[in-house]
Amino acid sequence: MDINTDKYKNITRNLEREMINLNPIQRGGILPTESKKIIYEYWDGYSVCDYCSGRLDQIETPPINEFLEDMSKFLGMDITRPTHGARESKYAVMNSICKEGDYVVLDGNAHYTSYVALERAKLNYEKTDIEEYPTFRVIPESYAEKIDMLEDSKKNIGLILLTHVDGNYGNVADVEKVGKIAKSKGYPFLLNCAYSAGRMPIDGKKLNVDFIAASGHKSMAASGPCGLLSINKKYENEVLETSKVNVLKELQMLGCTSRGIPILSLMASFEHLIERVKKWDLELEKTRKVVNELEPLGFKQIGEKPRNHDIIRFETPILDEIAEKDKRRGFFFYEELKKRGIGGIRRGVTKEFKMSVYGLTNTQVDYVINSMKSIINELR
Ligand SMILES: Cc1ncc(COP(=O)(O)O)c(C=O)c1O
């Protein structure tokens, strides 16, 4: 076999370490230095399995079993399992509690992974309404309407799914209202917390949710791929059913999920998560400051206002205007930010972009604001 492996010898991430990364999908997954030191010992394949006696969630060394119990407390749920991401968590719920052909009633801002999960589980869906431009908020009452409509036409509803914070606008949905509707109608309720758990405080019990899908690499300062599924005890038997052949192994987990660095990194970052969610108000202050400072430049923030989450989506007609006359065309903004050590804004975009300053220091936030101001004021 003639395979040239030279190209794998110097794989680098091609990202200057000092760069300030504004990509919302990446800000919540940055590991604190302490976690980086801990995972150094765990880079071998099945590194957490040295003392396994049959199942990942029961491993005592390293203390995965205790970590999962503590994580349940952190999320206000009863039982937690590691997964490879929020999408795998959603799929595990759908595949276990719904029957083929059932309907999932989900919000109009649901992520594509909710759709691929339900398609893979051979389910149908009904999408609820959202507000129009520019807020695009989920309308909780629409859940009741869609449920009534499906019931009237004798369709079987298997699950109610809500995206806690959507990735397009960063709107925080009214979970309590949707939870009340799901409960009063008697349907199980799954909350997709990919963009919330680990960034902001979550209490599943208070929110009336039956399942939480969380994402380690997106919002829990963990190496990807990694996630969590937290469930209400009531659903333990269905969701965590074990194999008839190997009675210890859970079917939806295909026996065991995260078997190395990802789960270990999540454990190593747990203390950091506990501390950082306490500072959510400060994150919102920084986010709102960015919006207030940048809108006068000719940006328009889309989604609910003021911001209740760190994702910021701006419409940017001013960048479009500059791109018309700049010889770098649409790439000027990316290039100018890069010169200033700022990355994470998509290359070539001028009509709108998304950003987040989650976890940056106040000095870094001011630097980002001033950099954008100076780019636009110099080139307009
Ligand atoms: C709202 C939302 N849910 C789920 C996901 C997927 O998360 P994961 O990669 O953990 O499956 C994303 C990723 O962008 C997301 O924005």
From Swiss-Prot:
The keyword Protein biosynthesis applies. GO terms for biological process: translation. Its cofactor is pyridoxal 5'-phosphate. SUPFAM superfamilies: PLP-dependent transferases (SSF53383). It comes from the Archaea. The modification N6-(pyridoxal phosphate)lysine is found at residue 218. InterPro entries: PyrdxlP-dep_Trfase, PyrdxlP-dep_Trfase_major, PyrdxlP-dep_Trfase_small, Sep_Cys-tRNA_synth_arc, SepSecS/SepCysS. GO terms for molecular function: Sep-tRNA:Cys-tRNA synthase activity. Pyridoxal 5'-phosphate binds at residues 86-87, 192, 215-217. It holds the Pfam family SepSecS. HAMAP family: Sep_Cys_tRNA_synth. NCBIfam families: PRK09331.1, SepCysS. Belongs to the SepCysS family. PANTHER family: CYSTEINE DESULFURASE, O-PHOSPHO-L-SERYL-TRNA:CYS-TRNA SYNTHASE. This is O-phospho-L-seryl-tRNA:Cys-tRNA synthase. It comes from Methanococcus maripaludis (strain DSM 14266 / JCM 13030 / NBRC 101832 / S2 / LL).
